[in-house]
């Protein structure tokens, strides 16, 4: 696979991470450097690690993984999206102004769950690369680095949108609903409904 093809693949794999980063930046309103670093590093790491794991798993579990990957991503994104939406509704109900979300998408368990959920596709790519007999390390590194950069851009875009719209609790609600929509779209893409 050429470097250009790997780069395009990395961009495609980073789109879920970009969407989550925009939502996170919007919900946080004024993300700090630590938010950029944590989200970019986590998403970049998982986008690097998942193809490597998929490559090592190889063909032996491919059919099993393809049968369940969309359900895993759906549950993880749905869980975080639901928490964000409920937090946004609470902020709106309590008429909190300029409140940061009570659910920090860049910390703790939320960060790990989002990292895994946005990189499930990369696991399948690793399986595919194993079938093609492609060496994994350089490709996985490119995928991880591209995802980290795209994630940082997404957080910045989300911050800009939040500042322009002064969204407050609406941003967190919209972010949660967006994650729920992404989760449902994953099931739609796998023809569940």
Curated annotation (Swiss-Prot):
Name the gene that codes for it: mntP
Q: Name one GO molecular function term.
A: manganese ion transmembrane transporter activity
Q: What is the protein's membrane topology class? A: Multi-pass membrane protein
Functionally, this protein is described as follows: Probably functions as a manganese efflux pump.
What transmembrane ranges does the database entry give? 3-23, 41-61, 69-89, 107-127, 130-150, 164-184
Which keywords describe this protein according to UniProt? Cell inner membrane, Cell membrane, Ion transport, Manganese, Membrane, Transmembrane, Transmembrane helix, Transport
InterPro entries the UniProt entry points to: Mntp/YtaF, Put_MntP
Q: Where in the cell is it found?
A: Cell inner membrane
Q: Which residues constitute the signal peptide according to the record?
A: none
Return the protein name.
Putative manganese efflux pump MntP
Keyword Iron annotated: no
**Coiled coil (UniProt feature):** none
Family stated for the protein in its record:
Belongs to the MntP (TC 9.B.29) family.
Gene Ontology cellular-component annotations: plasma membrane
């Amino acid at each position: 696979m050429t470097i250009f093809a790997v780069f395009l693949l990395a961009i495609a794999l980073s789109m879920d991470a970009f969407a989550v980063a925009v939502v996170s930046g919007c919900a946080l309103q004024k993300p700090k450097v630590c938010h950029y670093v944590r989200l970019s590093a986590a998403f970049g790491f998982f986008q690097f690690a998942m193809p490597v794991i998929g490559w090592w798993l190889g063909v032996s579990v491919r059919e099993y993984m393809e049968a369940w990957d969309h359900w895993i991503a759906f549950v993880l994104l749905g869980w975080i999206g639901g928490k964000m939406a409920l937090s946004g509704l609470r902020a709106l109900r309590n008429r909190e102004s300029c409140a940061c979300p009570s659910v920090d998408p860049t910390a703790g368990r939320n960060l790990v769950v989002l990292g895994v959920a946005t990189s499930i596709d990369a696991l399948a790519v690793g399986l595919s690369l194993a079938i093609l007999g492609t060496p994994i390390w350089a490709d996985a590194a490119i995928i991880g680095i591209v995802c980290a950069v795209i994630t940082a851009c997404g957080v910045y875009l989300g911050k800009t949108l939040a500042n322009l719209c002064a969204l407050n609790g609406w941003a967190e609600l919209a972010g949660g609903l967006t994650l729920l929509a992404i989760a449902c779209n994953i099931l739609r893409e796998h023809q569940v409904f």
